[in-house]
Amino acid sequence: MPVADTSQLISGVAERYASSLFELALEAGSIEAVGADLTRIQALIDGSADLKRLIVSPVFSADDQYKAISALVEKFGVSGLVGNFLKVVARNRRLFVLPGIIRAFRLLAARHKGEITADVTSAHALTPAQETELKAALKGVTGKDVAVNVTVDPSILGGLIVKVGSRQIDTSLRTKLSTLKLALKEVG
């Protein structure tokens, strides 16, 4: 199976799980709380190489993953809907799509609130003040509330790459240097 087909398959699985979680959260009236718990889980994944390995490695059995996730949700106080959901995902050996599930849930929650989502790539993590300022600037441009998904990619060297729908604004230092390099080649 080509790589593109595999990523679509993973995306489909993530969207189905996220949709199920969203419907349960909507019924319970806890979309915000579930979103906050998922944000905490994503932060834990981003901050721990061992947890990332547990999620993506097929070496761990479903039972090992279940026990680890159960301990994690208990230790960090992630209970109720998200805690049970994570256990089901682990039991079904679908932890490898957890980051995709979290992204898809955020999109569903944003759509439910009438927000649009901007994917932002930055060379460094944004401070809460920078994120708030970026949201305000994007709201001024789009006229809608904007939810921001920030990805850190040191290879862009500096600046931001912002994607909103089909539009992309690339102010990264890497792109500026590439443009300058091309301009110098044309001159020389």
UniProtKB/Swiss-Prot annotation:
The keyword Zinc-finger does not apply. It is found in: Cell inner membrane. The keyword Transport applies. Signal peptide: none annotated. GO terms for molecular function: proton-transporting ATP synthase activity, rotational mechanism. SUPFAM superfamilies: N-terminal domain of the delta subunit of the F1F0-ATP synthase. GO terms for cellular component: plasma membrane; proton-transporting ATP synthase complex. It is a peripheral membrane protein. Keywords: ATP synthesis, Cell inner membrane, Cell membrane, CF(1), Hydrogen ion transport, Ion transport, Membrane, Transport. It holds the Pfam family OSCP. It comes from the Bacteria. InterPro entries: ATP_synth_OSCP/delta_N_sf, ATPase_OSCP/d_CS, ATPase_OSCP/dsu. PANTHER family: ATP SYNTHASE DELTA CHAIN. F-type ATPases have 2 components, F(1) - the catalytic core - and F(0) - the membrane proton channel. F(1) has five subunits: alpha(3), beta(3), gamma(1), delta(1), epsilon(1). F(0) has three main subunits: a(1), b(2) and c(10-14). The alpha and beta chains form an alternating ring which encloses part of the gamma chain. F(1) is attached to F(0) by a central stalk formed by the gamma and epsilon chains, while a peripheral stalk is formed by the delta and b chains. F(1)F(0) ATP synthase produces ATP from ADP in the presence of a proton or sodium gradient. F-type ATPases consist of two structural domains, F(1) containing the extramembraneous catalytic core and F(0) containing the membrane proton channel, linked together by a central stalk and a peripheral stalk. During catalysis, ATP synthesis in the catalytic domain of F(1) is coupled via a rotary mechanism of the central stalk subunits to proton translocation. Belongs to the ATPase delta chain family. This is ATP synthase subunit delta. It comes from Sinorhizobium medicae (strain WSM419) (Ensifer medicae). The gene is atpH.
